[in-house]
Amino acid sequence: MNNLYRELAPIPGPAWAEIEEEARRTFKRNIAGRRIVDVAGPTGFETSAVTTGHIRDVQSETSGLQVKQRIVQEYIELRTPFTVTRQAIDDVARGSGDSDWQPVKDAATTIAMAEDRAILHGLDAAGIGGIVPGSSNAAVAIPDAVEDFADAVAQALSVLRTVGVDGPYSLLLSSAEYTKVSESTDHGYPIREHLSRQLGAGEIIWAPALEGALLVSTRGGDYELHLGQDLSIGYYSHDSETVELYLQETFGFLALTDESSVPLSL
């Protein structure tokens, strides 16, 4: 038995498979950060930190002895509970293909948004510096007129090239900006197609946890997401009508360079 205690849950294999697939599909649909950073691991739930490669001086109490302490990025542990009905579980055994897994979807969305917020906007309380606040480049203003969005992206691309950051470049858009870009045209030509041509090999990525937009290089080596325990489902408790489960993951995030992104802000 591991730390997830799944063996104690009154859930047969076929129902587990449906729950896991729903969680995986929803998480993947909502996640954006993993598409633009280097991902290492998973190395296991027991992993608690990743080295930054730096040290700091520690006052020595012995004459002639130097003491250094290695600096690490401690992992954070995300967990979100959800409840499924035993009716939905048992219906799978009866051959149902339409059990209600909405609680699974809601939990997967919650944890995906939390991971992306940490990567993109940081989590000060946990010592995680996000890509947006850590950028050394001045933010480019998102224009009021969506027809001018391509000009803002061109400006951001120019910034990255000027500071020597190679592509490919990807453009992350908040839900609101993604909708505007996808639904708008400029003299009959789709704005999204114009942006795609600007990016070349890069992607336009829906990022619901992002505020505004973000142009980032995906050349590699700039940002690292270190997974301890990747997204997993664990068991809390059950009664005669419901089973309480949870989604959990652990990770640390390192922003290794500060010049390889340009925020686009409202």
From Swiss-Prot:
Heme recorded as keyword: no
Main localization category: other
Pfam families: Linocin_M18 (PF04454)
Gene3D superfamilies listed in its UniProt record: 3.30.2400.30, hypothetical protein PF0899 domain
Keyword vocabulary terms for this entry: Encapsulin nanocompartment
Subcellular localization: Encapsulin nanocompartment
Role of this protein: Shell component of a type 1 encapsulin nanocompartment. Assembles into proteinaceous shells 23-24 nm in diameter with 2-2.5 nm thick walls. Endogenous cargo protein DyP (dye-decolorizing peroxidase) is targeted to the interior via its C-terminal extension; only 1 DyP hexamer is incorporated into each shell. Empty shells can be isolated in the absence of cargo. Cargo encapsulation probably precedes assembly of the nanocompartment; may assemble or disassemble via dimers, subcomplexes with a distinct preference for even numbers of subunits are detected.
Family: Belongs to the encapsulin family. Family 1 subfamily.
Protein name: Type 1 encapsulin shell protein
Species of provenance: Brevibacterium linens
